[in-house]
Amino acid sequence: MNNYTYKVNFNSISGVRHARIKCPIYTKNTF
């Protein structure tokens, strides 16, 4: 269970990084 949640968190963090590269304005509004 902990490993699964860790993978989900890691994927979400990497997804946020890609989103910032694509559209930083959108991520600034969300975060």
UniProtKB/Swiss-Prot annotation:
A Pfam family that the UniProt record links to this protein: ArgL-like
Record keywords: Translation regulation
Biological process per Gene Ontology, one example term: regulation of translation
Induction of synthesis: Expressed in equally in both exponential and stationary phase in rich medium (at protein level).
Other remarks in the entry: This gene lies upstream of and overlaps argL on the same strand in another reading frame.
Function: May serve a regulatory role in expression of downstream gene argF; in an argL-argF-lacZ fusion mutation of the start codon to a stop codon in argL increases expression of beta-galactosidase.
Protein name listed in UniProt: Putative translational regulatory protein ArgL
Taxonomic path: Bacteria, Pseudomonadati, Pseudomonadota, Gammaproteobacteria, Enterobacterales
